[in-house]
Amino acid sequence: MSTFLQQLVNGVTWGSVYALIALGYTMVYGILRLINFAHGDIYMLGAFMGLYASRWFHAAQDPSPVKALLVLLTSMLLSALIGMLIERLAYKPVRKSPRLSALITAIGVSLLLENGGVLVFGADPKFFPQLIPQKTIALLPGVAVSNQQLIVLVVSIVLMFALRMFVLHTRTGKAMQAVSHNHMAASLMGISVDRIITITFMIGSALAAAAGVLVALQSPKIEPYMGIMPGLKAFVAAVLGGIGNIPGAVVGGLVMGVAEVMVTGYLSPTYRDAIAFVLLIVILLVRPAGIFGKAVTEKV
C-alpha cells in the first residue's frame, strides 16, 4: 500500500507539470482551433530562460525562495514575449489559410526553436542550479515527498487557480470565452480578436515556461530537445481531457502523470513513454472528444 501511495504522490507531481503544459495547448485550440506543436519547445525555452535568470540574480551562489520566485517569474515573462512573437510572426499570417498550412507552420516553428536552441545554447546538456536545497518530508510510513515536489504542486495549483480566476472573472477572460465561441460575433461586439489571440499565446507560453523551471528544479539536466516528449505527452493529456476545455486539460495532465508513474513503477521504465500513446489510442477509440469534451458536428 505504501508503494502505491508513493507512486501516486510522484504521479500527481508529474501530472501537475503536464497539466500546465496542456493548458497552453487547450487554450490555443479553444481560440484558434490550432494545435501549436511548438508549445513543447516553449517549455524548453522556459527552462533555459530560468537558467540564465538564475545566473543574472546569482541565485546559485546565494539560493533563497525569493530568488527562486524571481527566476520563475522572469522565465515566465520572457517566454510570454517569445510566445507573442511566435504568434505575430508565424501564426497570424496563416490564420485565414487552410488548417494544413497552420499545422505545417507549427511543425516548422518547433524545428526552428529546437535547432535554434542548439545553435544558441549548444548541444551539450546544461545543469540547472539548485535554487532550493532538497529536503525529504515523511507523510506516512514508507511514503515521503521532497520539498521540491511540494513546490511543484503548490506553484502548479496557484497558477491553475489564477488562470481560472482570470478566465472567469476578468473582462479579458470573458472576452477570451467569447472569441472561443465565435470570432465574428466577438468582433462585432467590440472585442479585439487579434489582441485576445496574442494574450492567449502569452499566457500559454508563460505556463509552459513555469513547467520548464519546475521540472529543472527536480531534474537539473536541460538541453534543446528536452521539450519534445513532454510536449507530446501534454498534447495527449489535452486530448484526453477534451482539447479546448481548461478543466479537462488539468484532469488529463493528472491522469497522464499518474498513469506514467504507475507503469514505470509496476511494469517497466521501458513503457514510460509508450503509455501516453496507448492512452491516446484508447481515448480516440472510446471517446474521441475527451473526458470533458463535447462532440461537435461540422456543417459542410
Where are the predicted features?
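Inter-helical junctions in multi-pass inner-membrane proteins, predominant
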Residues: S2-V17, F166-R171, I197-A237, E260-D273
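Glycine-rich helix-loop "coupling/hinge" segments at transmembrane-helix boundaries
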Residues: G40-I42, S219-I246, G252, A276, ...
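Transmembrane helix-bundle core of multi-pass membrane transporters
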Residues: P93-V94, R99-H169, I196, P220, ...
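Short loop segments and helix-boundary regions at transmembrane helix junctions
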Residues: G30-A38, L81-D124, F166-G173, A178, ...
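Helix-loop-helix "hairpin" substructures at the membrane interface of multi-pass membrane proteins
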Residues: V143-I222, I246-G252
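Generic alpha-helical transmembrane segments of integral inner-membrane proteins
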Residues: L20, G24, L69, L73-L85, ...
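Single transmembrane alpha-helix segments in multi-pass membrane proteins
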Residues: F4-A53, L85-S101, L240-I246
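Alpha-helical transmembrane segments within multi-pass membrane transporters and channels
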Residues: Q61-V109, G116, V251-M256, E260, ...
